[in-house]
Amino acid sequence: LNAPTREERLANLKEVLKTTNFPPAVPQYINNHIHTTYSFSPYSPTAAVYAARMEGLCTAGIIDHDSISGAREFLEAAELIQMPVTIGMECRASMDGTAMEGKRTNNPDQVGVSYMTIQSVPHDKIDEVNAFFAPYREARHRRNRAMVEKINALLDGIALDYDRDVLPLSEAKENGGVTERHLM
């Protein structure tokens, strides 16, 4: 379910479903904040839906950083599994100019910056939402490249290359988010 392409992943899911018996869905088991390979999780959207249902979740939601590019695959996998799902994304937001300015909220690394989610994006707005966040993904790439330079300054005899070593670990080619975790 983590094959290289969306088409392969969904085809593999169809095969797996022929022999899968899911446990009963538990009404209290809900997770509408599931990251996928489109930000930093090792699970493809297909694998995430499958794993959620195997754990007895009655519903699930995709939330990737700065990207909603995995949403269509998540929806297709959910349809095959017959599981209701939501789609959304997560981004960092500056709290400057608000009552939360200068305060630490839910981001342990930055004062005055909060992680915010957009939930239940209408399916016909996926492209619009993703296009809106394209500049944020570009800013993240610049920040990540600067971090790679700082990491390389600490290394002796080896060097990390963002394009060669980091981007292939992500779904950046499909407008997925590349996070600090890809650098680890």
Language model features: what each stretch is:
Residues L1-K14:
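Low-complexity, highly charged intrinsically disordered N-terminal segments
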Residues P24-E174, V178:
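A metal-dependent hydrolase metal-coordination microenvironment
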